[in-house]
Amino acid sequence: MTELNKLTVADSIKGLKNKDFTSTELIGAHIKQIEKHRNLNAYVTDTFDLALKQAEAADQKYAQNNARTLEGIPFAAKDLFCTKGIRTTACSNILKNFIPNYESSVTQNIFDKGGVMLGKTNMDEFAMGSANITSCFGNVISPWKANDDNADLVPGGSSGGSAAAVSGFMASAALGSDTGGSVRQPASFTGLVGFKPTYGRCSRYGMISFASSLDQAGIFTRSVLDSSIMLEAMMGFDEKDSTSIKAEVPELQSAIGSSMKNMKIGVPLSLGEGSIIEPDIMKMWQDTIELLKNAGAEIVDITLPHAKYGVAVYYVIAPAEASSNLSRYDGVRYGLRVERENMTLDEMYEMTRSTGFGEEVKRRIMIGTYVLSSSGMDAYYLKAQKVRRLVANDFNNAFAKVDAILLPAAPTAAFKIGEKQNDPTIMYLNDLFTIPASLAGLPCASVPAGLSARGLPLGIQIIGKQLDEYNVLKVASTIESGVKHIKFEPKGF
């Protein structure tokens, strides 16, 4: 029998219903795995007592044949989802001891379906990073190793703790957030399915904000079916979020295994020209195109002429919104306060923020403050917003001809910790292929599609029309079936 912590969400639900094991046993297996792999630093707060209590309640529900859709299923939450009575820090010193008195809508939705929370996962501070190396709790180490080197690798970011937890069998699924690629890129680096739904599908209420017009909750799982199950639980209109979309939550699980006949897949191969894309990624992209063609899809050449400006646009708009959102951390109402005798209020603000924020967060606040200034507004911010509209228009034009778009999730495989962190521009380019869909608010997923020459997982990205999570899952499922001969599992786990 498969070890309990290695079961997918779907198989765990089946086993619990069949009474092959209890939720308490399932949770116990995951706790044991978490304790065994503390060195990866995936979790920053454990909630084992809560999890065992929730598991006992789940076992009673199964005994009474009254189980909900996620009854007894273990999940983890990125540490920017507020959890009532449980420390929530965004992995920043400025919030290191913050305990919310309310629950985020997304975690509440999962609890309402019977989910069991194992803990809060590590992340880049305030979700600003691509390698999970800016957390106040230290770096996250990927469970994966290259086959020619034993060096520690990054899990991707900013949701690196969630990716490491699911990839290392320390959670069946884990919540992340995706602003410019923070679910899709770590999923690619760790051999997982990472899904970012349409902007507004999941409530942002109770999510600590980075860039409000871009932030969206996402999910890490080890299968496309699991992704569909979790998305059905997470999504839904919420009147507490002004950007929440008033749309019915679709039935998604029937997308799995659906025929690709009459599906048109757009491929903007020109985006791979002259970029930093590695040869292994290019080969994986081409192989996936052939896979979908053989499955019955029609491949259509498309262009996204303004997508190449995505990174530049993103690093104007996102820091501008961050500068505004993070102005609330001033030491007055909550979080860190640095005080000295005879200190003025302005000095307290300055000391609190300079002590509490890390270097990358300070960099982005400074960029954002400048582009919102009188000299930067016309020169950068307003122009970036215009180009953002052009990027969205490119997608609209493409989707008049195709049902989904295929792109790599990242230009490279996972790299060594410390290898690129001294060059912010190189780090920002990790999101080269994920940012355009974020700017347009589109649903998209990364699904494992191959291994590099060094044995590291590579993810392909499927982008869908607004509110069309169904077709994204359909294409992802076809790709998953086509590469089922590849084992996307780190050695030693």
Swiss-Prot record:
How is this protein annotated for GO cellular component? Answer: glutamyl-tRNA(Gln) amidotransferase complex
Q: Which EC number(s) does UniProt give?
A: 6.3.5.7
Q: Name one GO biological process term.
A: translation
Here the disulfide bonds are: none
Keyword Secreted annotated: no
Q: Which SUPFAM superfamilies does this chain map to?
A: Amidase signature (AS) enzymes
Which keywords are on file for this protein?
ATP-binding, Ligase, Nucleotide-binding, Protein biosynthesis
Q: Where is the active site?
A: 78 (charge relay system), 158 (charge relay system), 182 (acyl-ester intermediate)
**Do you know which PROSITE patterns this protein is assigned to?**
AMIDASES
Q: Does the keyword Protein biosynthesis apply?
A: yes
Q: Which reaction does it catalyse?
A: L-glutamyl-tRNA(Gln) + L-glutamine + ATP + H2O = L-glutaminyl-tRNA(Gln) + L-glutamate + ADP + phosphate + H(+)
Q: Which NCBIfam families match?
A: gatA
Describe its function. Answer: Allows the formation of correctly charged Gln-tRNA(Gln) through the transamidation of misacylated Glu-tRNA(Gln) in organisms which lack glutaminyl-tRNA synthetase. The reaction takes place in the presence of glutamine and ATP through an activated gamma-phospho-Glu-tRNA(Gln).
How does this protein assemble? Heterotrimer of A, B and C subunits.
Similarity comment text for this entry: Belongs to the amidase family. GatA subfamily.
Name under which the protein is recorded = Glutamyl-tRNA(Gln) amidotransferase subunit A
